[in-house]
Regions:
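The feature preferentially marks the first beta-strand/turn patch immediately downstream
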Residues: 1-173
Length: 173
């Protein structure tokens, strides 16, 4: 709530997507839509993931196996930051659906964020197919551990219930 410019007011929709009055009966409400305006200028805590060189290139995004020698973000020489945006919130909501992240609230949130349960199934199928592909390519007797899978860019997956309308406006339904 502290990142919101003001407390969002829900808009209630019926089965056909029509806006309902605020005093509509609960039986008539099919969807609640929250439009959340974020305060501009909120920045991430300094972190090496945001560190860039003079040309604007990320310093530590291609470390590969060298990343294993660091046990703390504080060990990196350079730190950086950037503004928090509505796109970041959408990404984090999508992360709830990933089986790569332990999310104790997924079952609950799946009932409230449109498409979150479906996204969870899609991501599980994606990872299962990826594990099978890697196992086949490597000839291993066992599939790779989830922690050994390559990075999964959740921006490539749609979630109807969370949209960034612009950098500072988030819609959740």
């Amino acid at each position: 709530p502290l990142a919101a410019a003001e407390m969002p007011v829900p808009v209630y929709l019926d089965e056909a997507g029509n806006v309902l009055p605020d005093d509509a009966s609960l039986d008539a409400v099919k969807t609640s839509v929250y439009t959340i305006r974020l305060k501009p200028g909120i920045k991430y805590q300094p972190h090496p993931a945001f560190a860039k060189d003079a040309q604007g290139n990320f310093l530590y995004h291609q470390l590969g196996e060298d990343a294993r020698k660091y046990s703390s973000p504080l060990q990196f020489e350079q730190q950086g930051t950037r503004e928090l945006t509505a796109h970041d919130y959408v990404y984090e909501i999508k992360r709830l659906a990933s089986s790569r992240i332990v999310s104790p609230i997924l079952g609950h949130m799946g009932d409230y964020v449109e498409g979150l349960g479906d996204l969870s199934k899609t991501l599980q199928e994606h990872d299962k197919a990826l594990k099978e592909k890697i196992q086949k390519e490597t000839g291993s007797a066992f599939p790779p551990a989830t922690a050994d899978l390559p990075w999964l860019d959740l921006r490539e997956f749609d979630l109807p219930g969370a949209k960034a309308l612009d950098d500072h406006t988030l819609e959740v339904r």
